[in-house]
Amino acid sequence: MPGQQRRGGGSGGSDRRERRDRSGSGPAQEKNAYVERVVAINRVAKVVKGGRRFSFTALVVVGDADGTVGVGYGKAKEVPAAIAKGVEEAKKHFFKVPRIGSTIPHPVQGEEAAGVVLLKPASPGTGVIAGGPVRAVLECAGVHDVLSKSLGSSNPINIVHATVAALRGLMRPEEIAARRGLPLEDVAPPAMLRARAAGASV
């Protein structure tokens, strides 16, 4: 009888371990599936009757490094809370970025306030030639080969939103061909056509 009780207790412990493993594999895996980049953290003050109240704002870029990216802005009394709010806000504004392999389909320019960002496709192995705010957006979006130039404002908030505007302005070659009434062969880059001819997915 005592031996049976010990065996029963052992199986209960294994069941508890299995439950812990299952419970720990959900939200943690979902969180790790995204790439997060904190672009800017600022301290702001609100003047009230009793003095000034300080809080923090965080500009965060979140993406899956596979064509999906979003930007969020969080505000809280503590920096970690502001970042967490920014991450949740970014996830609400996810959008898809058209890509050809590891680069973008065509040159594009985005503008936001006084910020202007120019993006150009690059050959494999070039890497992300960009400054901090632009690089954060491109890496989270999964664009690994691209040339960029930031014109105008150096404010990271304007630069990030200008980069997002540029990525939103991208179109796949099929969309461009349909809009112009041309065959895909006249619009698509040669590398894309070669890849499709070889049976690779683009």
Curated annotation (Swiss-Prot):
Q: Pinpoint the S5 DRBM domain residues.
A: 34-97
In terms of superkingdom, the source organism counts as: Bacteria
Keywords attached to this entry: Ribonucleoprotein, Ribosomal protein, RNA-binding, rRNA-binding
**Gene Ontology cellular-component annotations:** small ribosomal subunit
- Name the residue ranges with Basic and acidic residues bias: 14-23
Give one GO molecular function term.
Answer: rRNA binding
Q: Which InterPro entries match?
A: Ribosomal_Su5_D2-typ_SF, Ribosomal_uS5, Ribosomal_uS5_bac-type, Ribosomal_uS5_C, Ribosomal_uS5_N, Ribosomal_uS5_N_CS, Ribsml_uS5_D2-typ_fold_subgr
Record-level GO BP terms? translation
| Pfam families linked to this entry | Ribosomal_S5 (PF00333), Ribosomal_S5_C (PF03719)
Q: Which residues form the signal peptide?
A: none
Q: Where is this region: Disordered?
A: 1-31
Q: Where is the composition biased (Gly residues)?
A: 1-13
Per the entry, what this protein does is: With S4 and S12 plays an important role in translational accuracy. Located at the back of the 30S subunit body where it stabilizes the conformation of the head with respect to the body.
Q: What is known of its domains?
A: The N-terminal domain interacts with the head of the 30S subunit; the C-terminal domain interacts with the body and contacts protein S4. The interaction surface between S4 and S5 is involved in control of translational fidelity.
Question: Which family, according to UniProt?
Answer: Belongs to the universal ribosomal protein uS5 family.
Q: How does it assemble?
A: Part of the 30S ribosomal subunit. Contacts proteins S4 and S8.
List the HAMAP family hit by this protein, alphabetically: Ribosomal_uS5_B
Provide the protein name: Small ribosomal subunit protein uS5
Species of origin: Frankia casuarinae (strain DSM 45818 / CECT 9043 / HFP020203 / CcI3)
Question: The organism's lineage?
Answer: Bacteria, Bacillati, Actinomycetota, Actinomycetes, Frankiales
